[in-house]
A protein has these predicted regions:
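Glycan-processing catalytic domains of CAZymes
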Residues: 1-156
Length: 156
């Protein structure tokens, strides 16, 4: 992973990179936590201002919480987000002061559900939110319907 970070910095130029998004991270074992710490320290060693986003797509442990600036702690369909949300396990996620470090991604949402999802994200301490009505297998390949209306709802 460090080589990959270096390749990006070399190719794009360190002044053109503001951070890194690490997908599919895990935090179940000490080895996984230590690996994320190593990556986090390496990226921050390149520039303290680099943003580190880690995406486990699920609740995190307190052990890993220091090793990213933002964690994607929920990446699910609107149905799951509304009806079967996996509650946080860590004190980190439950602490309101950490909302700025928590990001929820909700796909397959009907635009009529946007307001409800926004309300739930606030109740669930997510300071960052992405909603799309796009669906699997790649729900991130187009702009969400009613995007401007959604942004206005979020900014209320």
């Amino acid at each position: 992973m460090k080589d990959e970070v270096d390749r990006y910095l070399e190719f794009y130029g360190k002044d053109n990179i503001n951070g890194f998004f690490f997908d599919e991270i895990a935090s179940d074992t000490l080895k996984q936590v230590n690996y994320m710490k190593e990556i986090f320290d390496y990226v921050k060693g390149k520039s303290k201002s680099n943003l580190v986003i880690a995406n486990p797509g699920a609740p995190i442990t307190d052990a890993i919480s220091p090793y990213a600036d933002i964690f994607v702690t929920s990446e699910v369909s609107a149905n799951v987000y509304v009806n079967k949300f996996e509650k946080p396990k860590s004190d980190f996620e439950k602490n309101k002061v950490n909302a700025k470090h928590i990001w929820h991604i909700v796909h397959s949402a009907n635009p009529k559900e946007y307001a409800r999802i926004i309300r739930l994200s606030r109740e669930r301490n997510a300071g960052w939110l992405m909603i799309t009505d796009d669906v699997m297998p790649n729900p991130y390949d187009r702009e969400p319907s009613k995007f401007v209306e959604m942004v206005n709802m979020i900014n209320k």
